[in-house]
Curated annotation (Swiss-Prot):
Keywords: ATP-binding, Cytoplasmic vesicle, Endoplasmic reticulum, Lipid transport, Magnesium, Membrane, Metal-binding, Nucleotide-binding, Translocase, Transmembrane, Transmembrane helix, Transport. The gene is ATP8B3. It comes from the Eukaryota. This is Phospholipid-transporting ATPase IK. Residues 1-98, 1272-1300 are annotated as: Disordered. GO terms for cellular component: acrosomal membrane; endoplasmic reticulum membrane; membrane; phospholipid-translocating ATPase complex; plasma membrane; trans-Golgi network.
Amino acid sequence: MGTGPAQTPRSTRAGPEPSPAPPGPGDTGDSDVTQEGSGPAGIRGGETVIRAGMGDSPGRGAPERRHKAQPGRARKYEWRPEGPTSMGSLGQREDLQDEDRNSAFTWKVQANNRAYNGQFKEKVILCWQRKKYKTNVIRTAKYNFYSFLPLNLYEQFHRVSNLFFLIIIILQSIPDISTLPWFSLSTPMVCLLFIRATRDLVDDMGRHKSDRAINNRPCQILMGKSFKQKKWQDLCVGDVVCLRKDNIVPADMLLLASTEPSSLCYVETVDIDGETNLKFRQALMVTHKELATIKKMASFQGTVTCEAPNSRMHHFVGCLEWNDKKYSLDIGNLLLRGCRIRNTDTCYGLVIYAGFDTKIMKNCGKIHLKRTKLDLLMNKLVVVIFISVVLVCLVLAFGFGFSVKEFKDHHYYLSGVHGSSVAAESFFVFWSFLILLSVTIPMSMFILSEFIYLGNSVFIDWDVQMYYKPQDVPAKARSTSLNDHLGQVEYIFSDKTGTLTQNILTFNKCCISGRVYGPDSEATTRPKENPYLWNKFADGKLLFHNAALLHLVRTNGDEAVREFWRLLAICHTVMVRESPRERPDQLLYQAASPDEGALVTAARNFGYVFLSRTQDTVTIMELGEERVYQVLAIMDFNSTRKRMSVLVRKPEGAICLYTKGADTVIFERLHRRGAMEFATEEALAAFAQETLRTLCLAYREVAEDIYEDWQQRHQEASLLLQNRAQALQQLLGATAIEDRLQDGVPETIKCLKKSNIKIWVLTGDKQETAVNIGFACELLSENMLILEEKEISRILETYWENSNNLLTRESLSQVKLALVINGDFLDKLLVSLRKEPRALAQNVNMDEAWQELGQSRRDFLYARRLSLLCRRFGLPLAAPPAQDSRARRSSEVLQERAFVDLASKCQAVICCRVTPKQKALIVALVKKYHQVVTLAIGDGANDINMIKTADVGVGLAGQEGMQAVQNSDFVLGQFCFLQRLLLVHGRWSYVRICKFLRYFFYKSMASMMVQVWFACYNGFTGQPLYEGWFLALFNLLYSTLPVLYIGLFEQDVSAEQSLEKPELYVVGQKDELFNYWVFVQAIAHGVTTSLVNFFMTLWISRDTAGPASFSDHQSFAVVVALSCLLSITMEVILIIKYWTALCVATILLSLGFYAIMTTTTQSFWLFRVSPTTFPFLYADLSVMSSPSILLVVLLSVSINTFPVLALRVIFPALKELRAKEEKVEEGPSEEIFTMEPLPHVHRESRARRSSYAFSHREGYANLITQGTILRRGPGVSSDIASESLDPSDEEAASSPKESQ
């Protein structure tokens, strides 16, 4: 590997040699597969060969290395090439040392034996047991046929309003206290429950459909002696599965064999960790050799003993017991569910974990019931209203008691009217008033809100501007109850790969000898026809065209140009796949990373074609001439070296060292710094400005005597070549690769940042790649100070010393901050990441936490400084001391809070190398300590847990895999659509629902508080003022349509203005449109309206001698009702800002319904049918026929409207006009001060920012040099040097003893 020893030729290398190979294509007879204590094992006649050409390259004849059997060690250790064995961070291989170690493993699986695996049980509760091993069926839906009704009712009655209505319905069913018909509340309640249940059922049916699509995917399972086509849901633990190229792995499986050499298997894990580069997995050598036929696979009875299912994506320890021998297993032998098989024709695996036991499903988390901030606020407001109604009812009940007592005292001769005691009658009147005033919390408001949420969701589905035509993906609201949350988002947590980027890397530009070549270069003239017709190996998909560069290549005019392309064709780990029969001249490259594939393809198009490789040779075609280079050593990429080097011998005999890597390490090792080097630096700076991913190329010729000396003595290259600064003689140039972003990503992020939304990128990819994308999408900028581990430690030290004072305002105003951290550092820093998620639910008061730690302040600060020193020197993180568990928990909370506070003060946060569980816990931490609305967006299975944890989850469709979509609340086709989803639909939904709630509370109080004032004048008897039909139809017809229009169509600004002025989005983040204060204002406004309507009518009704006189209850009720209806109609007219014909129609229809229904219910013919049901006979006509009464109604409406009109329209307009006049009088203002540009913080010795980013995976060089990865090779192989020839690689070089 890159940090370990490089390789020496086999003739000079001490130690054991690799294992033997099976016969080559031309061999006959039995293969060389052997087992300890047995002779050669061939393939018997009649057996079907499932693996052709498997094994190591021919000519490798030494037996495999084994540990000798020792007493008490009944196991076998198998040698195989050392390489990376984890997906994200390199997992450390853990071999089992003795039998006692196996006792810690609780998971035991036997191959091809379902009966054996099915006997294991686990206790659930009491005596109830179930099968220990889960099936491979995935269920993300919340309900099934039996659980839907009870579970849905249980969830619905978590709403306080539903409980309130249920209590009122129960009280209403008691005849002695009921003041309204039983069906007046029970019918709306049933409708409300039915509507919400239907909505939940539709949402859950979509989940069931997605689950069926996944569970019904086809796979091949070994049944008996053949593989049969089955479904994913039919898989069981212990089954042997056959996977083909491009198949998705259906469960966590132990790799048994593959058609690749040495049973390698290449997998793409972009759906798990977001990395685009390929990773390799390798089967055990024993299964690779022995399981070569279907018959042998069917008779395989090996037993795997391993750790129980867990969420650690990069860790696995176990052993395989087979034929009385044991073989250790690690993550490098495991294929995880969700991976996609790449560049491997066929592989075979043994299912270890299935279904919800798989690692990816362990990281997915549980389905949470998401509630919006307004929904939670409504629960609290319902409690407040209920308590207020109870208090009012108590006051009215006491008033009734005093009234009855006074009546009995003054009218003792009518004592029979009140036969019961005063207390008993007051008790019953209390409940009567409670039922009468229960409509203060109108059930119709909750019913209409369901239609409003549904309608706004439909508008999202219908928005053609969020339709992604290339992949036919429309926007979709999978959850219909979170629309207003879209207008309150403060934090966005985004995946990188597939979310911000397209996963497409293209060769964009290059710089050779200080001259830039590329599509945008002045020297570039785009040809009218294909310039690569002369090259039969050219890839027509490459879009890089440069006529001047092509002319230099074809005329051999510049040696540096030839060396440039020669380096790209030689210095890599790419393999050549077999060409299709119909196109024998077409080369198929197998690249470990898209970066290397793009570089080798570019060299191929310019005439330097990589043809093939063996263990110690590379064959390329240079402008039609085939040349073979002998590979003497390969030094692979790693995170420390940041470069790859290849030492080759040219056909002419000269030895040359080719190196490509980061500019920061290449320039430090140049022989000289001339004009060409400075020109290359300028080109790199320009490439960095364009956010291209760059690599520098350099080489040097190595003298024969130096190489021979190195070969014989195995000394470090830094000692041999003496001068580190002169290790590379000549700089060839630089390459620039474009990691294409999705369309509109930079503009979207810029707009969202203006909306006061903080964007965090959480990715499993490497840090260099993530930072490069951060600059490309303008999340990071050159004037930002990027904080990494050391800076974070220093700042947190200040936090602890200053007692919860993280950063001063002065320090924040000086520079913009960005945070870049990795998952390992988060694991050390945040205690919650090492605990169960329920630890995040523990709330510790911050003041109490500091008080707990105040007693041991000195020791605490000393321990914190010690912890920081431990971090700096790479030692385990020291935890602050605590006297007891509570103090320890307090310190943990403070440590978490410090990190969240620091991150929240940064302009951008990028978390690299994080697991799916870490993504979710980061989101949970922000929610815990900042109580803000969070949104998570991603496209892969590794984003599911994050999407579920966030308040709003958005899944991107159209990428590989739909698991993120199935667990999301909203579906988009591209990241750029998030801008319109939040700023337009989210903001509109928030504005609409807030205006709807405010208006509904206002009109409810305006209409219902009249009952209270009326009770003060009727002896507190509980007699309703209004006609019964007015109460029944008020929220159904008379006032519903305008408020429904507000909830569905209201727009305070247009969609274009919402996008042009993203600052308007802040109103939702600050809860400005509906909060406790707005609620109090609405209630107060409704109370004042009811006072005006009631007492104005009461005042005119006392004028019994005037022309507007009326003294009957019915006329009084009609006048109050009419005043109330017109007042709330004027209020809705003032609220609406988006006027359309539909808006006018809803207002006219509401008034028309009132006129028609009032005339009908108070007509003579209905009175004749049922006088008790329709008692208001011609009351409307007596009111409408009196101009004086109508004038009183108009006066009441005017008194209610004019103050509101002045506050909302006249005063703001005058204030704005006055501000404009003052601005004109003052004239153009001069700048009092100018903001100086922020100083650029240089993290390197040079001022230029390095845009190096390479997604290559460490370990492929060893596979090549050991022959593990090769199908064919020469008759005599040679291992690569065991020491690094890279003269600057002190850490990679090794001594002779180490190589042995």
